[in-house]
Amino acid sequence: MKLSFIVPIYNTEPFILERCFESINCIEKLEYECILIDDGSKGEIGEFCADYSNNHKRFKYFRKKNGGVSSARNEGIRKAKGEYIYFVDSDDTIITDVFDQFVHGYENADLVFTDLILVDGQHKCRWGNMLGTTYDMVLKRLIMDGKINGPYAKFWKKDFLERNGLLFDETMVSGEDALFLLSFLCCNPKMMYANVDTYLYYKESKSGDNRISMYPYICIQDCEKKYKKILECIECGNYEKKEKVELMIQETEQLIHELFGLEMSMISVNVWDSKANSKFTEIIENINGDLCEKVNKISKLKLGIMKS
């Protein structure tokens, strides 16, 4: 099985890039390529990536005009030659040892979930323990804690992505990872789970960005887009009626929580205005009234504040 690692890059410091690249370069037996997609980084970053790829034949460097991480990942998907794709953020690393021994036994899957380790300073926390890989189980896990939303620590079958026209939504600036997985689920994939850690996610290197100040209205739309998609997926599931309603309530509580946090952030960076208020009002009014009645007290309080 040939694997394509896709690493989107935007102004990541060279010493952090080297940490990422070296974790992949240490793989010995697995046939792979590593596709570096430079999303318009400043000059010295591009030079470092180009030099590294020139000295490591399995690394391929491509530079493109800045279009966001979804655009970079999509470019990587189009260029990938491997049977499976594995996404790596440029400030994270893979757990090298497992890749040489992992690949056998999963060749028929369209998506293989693995586990990751969250690194937060000196603390490490394992994110894993999937209870199952049916549509209903994966969707429920996505709703319950959001720990499987990201594209990393997963092996995506390239042919399945192509046959179903699956790409990341380049119009979104937040929530695009979850929407990609939701769209994938809707295509009836064969999914498997490997109880093995393959990825180190470095929380301390994830600097806060300025998406809210730059794209406030898109951030609002993204919240609604993800919410509608999840409700649509819940409707398509084989849940009992009671469980289906419970999942919808939980997702509605999550939407309210996200909208409330977004409103506070927009106010703090001075981008809250009448247009934003109008968009919030429209989203809130479109939430099913029965669901609003059934959310918890904290959600009702937040909803009341946003309506005032």
Regions found by a protein language model. Give the residues of each.
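N-proximal low-complexity "stem/linker" segments adjacent to membrane-targeting elements
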Residues: M1-S23
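Short hydrophobic beta-strand elements that form part
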Residues: S4-P8, I35-L36, R63
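Short, acidic, metal-binding catalytic loop of nucleotide-sugar glycosyltransferases
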Residues: E22-E31
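A conserved acidic beta->alpha catalytic loop
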Residues: D38-F48, D89
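Glycine-rich, basic loop-to-helix element that forms the pyrophosphate-binding segment
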Residues: K64-A80
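Donor-binding/catalytic cores of nucleotide-activated saccharide
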Residues: V69, S90-A194, Y199-I218
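Short aromatic/hydrophobic "clamp" motif used to bind/position activated sugar donors
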Residues: I85
